[in-house]
Amino acid sequence: DLVERHDVDVLTTCAPDSRTWKNEYAEGSDKIRGVNVRRFAVKEPHDHDAFTRLTSRLRSEPHTRADELEWVRMLGPSAPGLIEHLKRQHKHYDALVFFSLQHATTVQGTAVAPERSVIFPYLLPRPSLRFGLWSDMIASSRGVGLFSAAERPLLHAFLPESGHEELVGVGIEPATQLTYPRHQQDPNDAVTPDDDLPSDAEAPVSEDYLSGRGVPFRRRHRLYGPLALYGGRLESDNGSEELLEYFDAYSQTNPDATLVLMGVKMVSIPDNPHIRLAGVLPYRDRMFAYEAADVTLAPSSDDLLAQPLLESLAVGTPALASARNAAAVEHLRRAEAGLYYGSKEEFVDALTLLMTNTKLRERLGENGRQYARLHLRWDAALGRFERLVGRVKRS
């Protein structure tokens, strides 16, 4: 734990949603799990339409550094209080670690003390990577950290060589042995006479789905057949709407299967008997959900951290991911723990194979469990993080 060995301040904004930058948290300092979190108000809302128009213009026309800085300002977040805090206090920090290359707080914050700055750029294949602004930021900073090996080709293709570069990766909490006593710890998980009855009176209950892995989740949500799980925000630009369309095509020939959606709902969900909304779940229930699933679905093309996919692998559930997500594909290839798709037809074929081939699922699931145990340890990821920051302190 970094907090046990270092004094850590987290500087962030009061706005949880980058699509609006609306302030929803109180400004000021708070302790969260032993970490001092300082929140600063965002002064300008995000104008999505104006930002989209500027992005399109800069992509197709010659532009200046001033145009790039205006693009950064419009992307946001505009948090002048955060930048003023850095200007006053940066000498009290051994290192300043910034996450996401292109946001205004990173561009303005690294300019305060580049000699103390480490950047985790969170690189995605976007036309804006060609902006000259990023090269100057990387060249003046003291280190670059990467979450995924998929970022490295982009870093080397578009940005200058950094003095210190580290593939830090990510960690996943170890999957503890989840037990399912006759009387669950949570009263809602207790066995009742109704637990042995299907939600649809005409749907037969398969005892295979009421024993073993994921029992509490299946009982609570009355899930008695093949189950695919999506964990993440349900929004218009992260692949979840496409997932709903693809699963609808799959369910036309596989009516027994259910898709469970686990996360914040920000788009309308179609009225479909094959789709269930579980909402936002705490860690323990989330792990029960991954164990209950036959397959976890990862449709986002932009999720470099791929946390839902990795949590699924950690408990031994194989995944089916979008081929557009280089980080997810990299994990699945290295782990040999799932499949990926590039079209609706490939999605339907791959999900059909995974749902109907028990031995394949078991083999992929065990591969994923071993991969998480060997390569997704938090102590190893934090050790690499400290090594990167330590180099900055010594330079």
Residue ranges and their predicted role:
Residues G145, A190, D194, P198-D200, ...:
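Conserved donor-binding/catalytic core segment of Leloir-type glycosyltransferases
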Residues R182, D186, T356-V389:
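A charged, aromatic-enriched C-terminal amphipathic alpha-helix characteristic of glycosyltransferases
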Residues G263-M287:
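Nucleotide-activated donor-binding/catalytic signature segment of Leloir-type glycosyltransferases, i.e.
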Residues I269-P270, R324-A335, Y340:
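Short acidic/histidine- and often glycine-rich active-site loop of Leloir-type glycosyltransferases
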Residues F288-A293:
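Short alpha-helical donor nucleotide-sugar binding micro-motif in glycosyltransferases
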Residues S301:
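Aromatic "clamp/platform" in nucleotide-sugar-dependent glycosyltransferases that forms part
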Residues P318-S322:
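Short hydrophobic beta-strand element within catalytic cores of glycosyltransferases
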Residues R334, G338-E345, L353-T358:
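Conserved acidic donor-binding segment of nucleotide-sugar-dependent glycosyltransferases
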